[in-house]
C-alpha cells in the first residue's frame, strides 16, 4: 500500500479525469490483506481502516466510494471473516454519503453480508468465490470423456457461466433487505 499522502495525490488525478468524463471512482486506503493476483499481504490490527484517515482521504480526493478494511482479507475462502461492526458504524457515521465497499467478501457469511448491507455497505466483492467456482466447473467440463478438439467453446464454458450467474443472483438477493 502507498503512503496515504501519495495515495491521495494519485487518486486526486484519477478523480479529476474520471469525474470530468462522468465516471465514478472507488478508492482504497491502507491494505486489506490476504492474497490477490499472487501477492500475499499479512493481516494484522494495523491494517484496519482508521476512521480519521478515511475521512481525510475522502475529503481530499472526493471519491464516490471507499474500500474499507473491517476484518476481511483478499482471497479468503477457507475461513470465516470476523467483521468489526463497531468500526463499520464509525466509518459510516464519519463518511456519510460515500459508498462503503468491502473487499474480500468471499469469506463473509450470508448473515454477516446482510448485516454489512444493513449497516451501510454498498458493494461487496466476492471475486475469489467466483474464480474458484468458475475454475472448478471448467476443470470438470474440459476433462469430460466426450470432449474432442471439435467441441464448441460455448459447450465447454457455458456451464461455468451458468454457475457464476447462479452465484451472482444469490449474492444480489442478500442486498434486498
Mark where each language-model region is.
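An acidic- and aromatic-residue-enriched active-site/binding cleft used to recognize and process polar
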Residues: 30, 105, 129
Amino acid at each position: 500500500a502507498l503512503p496515504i499522502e501519495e495515495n491521495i495525490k494519485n487518486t486526486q488525478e484519477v478523480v479529476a479525469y474520471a469525474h470530468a468524463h462522468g465516471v465514478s471512482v472507488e478508492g482504497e486506503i491502507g491494505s486489506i490483506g490476504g492474497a490477490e493476483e499472487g501477492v500475499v499481504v499479512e493481516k494484522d490490527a494495523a491494517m484496519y481502516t482508521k476512521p480519521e484517515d478515511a475521512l481525510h482521504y475522502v475529503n481530499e480526493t472526493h471519491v464516490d466510494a471507499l474500500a474499507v478494511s473491517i476484518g476481511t482479507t483478499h482471497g479468503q475462502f477457507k475461513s470465516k471473516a470476523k467483521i468489526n461492526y463497531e468500526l463499520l458504524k464509525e466509518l459510516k457515521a464519519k463518511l456519510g454519503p460515500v459508498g462503503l465497499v468491502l473487499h474480500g467478501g468471499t469469506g463473509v457469511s450470508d448473515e454477516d453480508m446482510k448485516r454489512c448491507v444493513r449497516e451501510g455497505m454498498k458493494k461487496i466483492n466476492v471475486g475469489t468465490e467466483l474464480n474458484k467456482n468458475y475454475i472448478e466447473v471448467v476443470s470438470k467440463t474440459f476433462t469430460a470423456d466426450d470432449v474432442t478438439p471439435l467441441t464448441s467453446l460455448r459447450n465447454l464454458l457455458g456451464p461455468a457461466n451458468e454457475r457464476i450467474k447462479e452465484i451472482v443472483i444469490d449474492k444480489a438477493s442478500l442486498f434486498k433487505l
